[in-house]
Amino acid sequence: MTRFRLTVEFDGRPFMGWQRQAHGPSVQQAIEEAITAVTGERAVIHAAGRTDARVHGRAMTAHADIAKPITPFRLKEALNARLRPAPVAILACEPVAGDWHARFSCVGRRYVYRIVNRRAPLTFDAGLAWQVAADLDDQAMHAAAQCLVGRHDFTTFRSAHCQAESPVKTLDRLDVRRSGELIEIEAAARSFLHHQVRSMVGCLALVGRGRWTAADLADALAAADRARLGLNAPPDGLYFMEAVYPAETGETAR
């Protein structure tokens, strides 16, 4: 039995999310069915994160245990062939230690949220970004975002369906940058609560529109009350960018 680490890219638009669902297609199901077709084995894959419906992945990390003798290259090529025409691609495949785990060995996760700030309808970016027609002050958004960095109770920014034991998380970075009409919001932490990134982005958009101040955002955080959330951004603009592991950071897994 060999444990393979998979790096997965996917367009979230056709899927109900990463995790298997009873009521619709998922990225996990697509990959597991491809593994079964290639190896003849019933596969269960584990991932660094579980994205919602219509959320995308640039480099989601997952792992699968496979008994059939197969090289990483042949496995990657065979899976990509089986996955077509689904918008899912295996970017990399490598053997790892049997105790390595895509979720539990992970020490950092990074997301990027894309906003297209223009009035004209989206053509190429439809379903791949959040269109905001009102002018956004990206500098005000970035300045306000810094009050969220650090260790806090993020109850205000947590979905009512979140299964995490504690709402306390440490946000390592929250940066807002603009290039023309594109605004990208980058968030990095060891882990996130359900809907945390989208909730933070929605409130930052209120700051960018001048409807909230930085103080309003800080007050919403301090309230630790989901009812104080100003706006939850849609899933379309959210991308899981990478998962970080101890060998890549020098940190010890815990």
UniProtKB/Swiss-Prot annotation:
Reaction(s) catalysed (UniProt annotation): uridine(38/39/40) in tRNA = pseudouridine(38/39/40) in tRNA
Gene3D superfamilies, per database record: Pseudouridine synthase I, catalytic domain, C-terminal subdomain (3.30.70.660), Pseudouridine synthase I, catalytic domain, N-terminal subdomain (3.30.70.580)
The keyword RNA-binding belongs to this UniProt entry's keyword annotation: no
Annotated EC: 5.4.99.12
Active site, UniProt feature: 52 (nucleophile)
Biological process according to GO: tRNA pseudouridine synthesis
Keywords carried by this UniProt record: Isomerase, tRNA processing
Keyword tRNA processing: yes
UniProt: substrate binding residues: 111
InterPro entries, sorted: PsdUridine_synth_cat_dom_sf, PsdUridine_synth_TruA, PsdUridine_synth_TruA_a/b_dom, PsdUridine_synth_TruA_C, TruA/RsuA/RluB/E/F_N
Molecular function GO terms recorded: RNA binding; tRNA pseudouridine(38-40) synthase activity
Subunit structure, interactors included: Homodimer.
Family: Belongs to the tRNA pseudouridine synthase TruA family.
Role noted for this protein: Formation of pseudouridine at positions 38, 39 and 40 in the anticodon stem and loop of transfer RNAs.
Annotated protein name in UniProt: tRNA pseudouridine synthase A
Source species taxonomy: Bacteria, Pseudomonadati, Pseudomonadota, Alphaproteobacteria, Sphingomonadales
